C-alpha cells in the first residue's frame, strides 16, 4: 500500500504519552502481544535515534514496525524517502492518518521477513545502500537483522532499538558470557556501537526488560578473509550450541560438520590452540582461520 500525502512537511506531532493515548483511543486500537508492540513515548530518545542514524535528505530509510507512525514522522523530516513495513493491518488506518502530512513515506502492510528488501532498495533507491532504523519487536530481532545481512541487502547502517541483553551480545568479545554466534555474525558484517540504554518507562506498554539503541555500521569489506562463508557460520553455530563442551566436541557432535574427530582436532591444534579450548575463547579471525583450514579437507 502506497502512502501519499501533502507537499508540506510538518514537525512531528507524536512522541509523548498524551498524543499516543489520543491516537490509540481514537481508533480503538488494542496492543497485540504476538507482534511484540511497545510504542516509544519519549521525544528525547527519538531525537537520539535520529541523530545517531546520521540521516540526510540523500537517504532512503527502511523502518520496520512503525506502529502508529511516531518515529516515522521524525524519519520523514530527516530523510529523502522512508519505506515503513508494518505487519499489523489494524495499524494501517492509523498510519494513513498520522503520516498524511508526509509525502515521502510509503507504508507496506506485510511481514518484513517475507519482503524482498533488495527489491525495495532497487525500486526506491536505485539499488544504492539504504539505512535501516527501527524500534524492533524483541521476539524477532535476530531473524530480522540476520535476514538483512544474509540476503546481502545494500545497507549503510542499521540503527535499532533492541533488548539490552541482545545489544550487549552484539558488541561483546571473546570470554564474555554474552559472547556467541550473534556477536560473531554481527561483527562479521558490521561495527556495533551501543548509543544509549533506554528504560521501560519510555514505552507504552512498558516492556519487562531494559532496552538499548545500537548502531551497526556496515563494513565495506569483511574484516576477515574466509573462503567459505557458509562453512564458517556452521562452525560458529556448532561451537556455541553446546557451550559447555570443548570446541572439538561441539564440532564433532554437529550434524552440519561431518568430519572425523581427528581432522577437527588437528585443525584446532594448527591454530595453536589446545584440545580443551572452547568456542567462546576464539575471535572472529580465529574462526575464519579454522574455517579455511577445515574447508581444505572437505
What are these regions (language model features)?
Residues 1-238, 269, 280, 289, ...:
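Catalytic cores of RNA-modifying enzymes
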Residues 218, 237-298:
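C-terminal lobe and adjacent flexible extensions of AdoMet/dcAdoMet transferase-like proteins
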Amino acid at each position: 500500500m502506497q502512502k501519499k500525502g501533502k507537499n508540506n512537511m510538518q514537525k512531528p506531532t507524536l512522541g509523548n504519552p498524551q498524543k499516543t493515548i489520543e491516537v490509540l483511543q481514537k481508533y480503538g486500537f488494542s496492543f497485540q502481544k504476538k507482534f511484540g508492540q511497545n510504542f516509544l513515548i519519549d521525544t528525547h530518545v527519538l531525537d537520539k535515534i535520529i541523530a545517531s542514524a546520521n540521516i540526510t535528505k540523500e537517504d532512503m530509510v527502511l523502518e520496520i514496525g512503525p506502529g502508529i507512525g511516531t518515529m516515522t514522522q521524525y524519519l520523514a523530516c530527516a530523510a529523502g524517502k522512508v519505506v515503513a513495513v508494518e505487519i499489523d493491518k489494524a495499524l494501517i488506518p492509523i498510519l494513513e492518518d498520522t503520516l498524511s502530512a508526509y509525502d515521502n513515506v510509503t507504508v507496506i502492510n506485510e511481514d518484513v521477513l517475507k519482503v524482498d528488501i533488495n527489491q525495495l532498495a532497487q525500486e526506491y533507491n536505485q539499488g544504492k545502500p539504504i539505512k535501516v532504523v527501527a524500534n524492533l519487536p524483541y521476539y524477532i530481532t535476530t531473524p530480522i537483522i540476520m535476514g538483512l545481512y544474509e540476503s546481502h541487502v545494500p545497507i549503510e547502517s542499521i540503527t535499532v532499538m533492541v533488548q539490552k541483553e541482545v545489544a550487549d551480545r552484539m558488541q561483546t568479545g571473546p570470554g564474555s558470557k554474552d559472547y556467541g554466534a550473534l556477536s560473531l555474525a554481527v561483527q562479521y558484517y558490521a561495527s556495533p556501537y551501543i548509543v544509549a540504554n533506554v528504560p521501560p518507562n519510555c514505552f507504552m506498554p512498558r516492556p519487562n526488560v531494559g532496552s538499548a539503541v545500537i548502531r551497526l555500521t556496515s563494513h565495506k569489506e569483511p574484516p576477515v578473509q574466509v573462503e567459505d562463508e557458509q562453512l564458517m557460520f556452521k562452525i560458529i553455530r556448532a561451537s556455541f550450541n553446546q557451550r559447555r563442551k570443548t570446541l572439538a566436541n561441539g564440532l564433532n557432535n554437529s550434524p552440519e560438520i561431518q568430519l572425523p574427530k581427528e581432522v577437527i582436532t588437528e585443525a584446532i591444534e594448527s591454530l595453536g590452540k589446545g584440545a580443551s579450548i572452547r568456542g567462546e575463547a576464539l575471535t572472529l579471525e580465529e574462526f575464519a582461520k579454522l574455517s579455511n583450514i577445515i574447508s581444505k579437507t572437505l
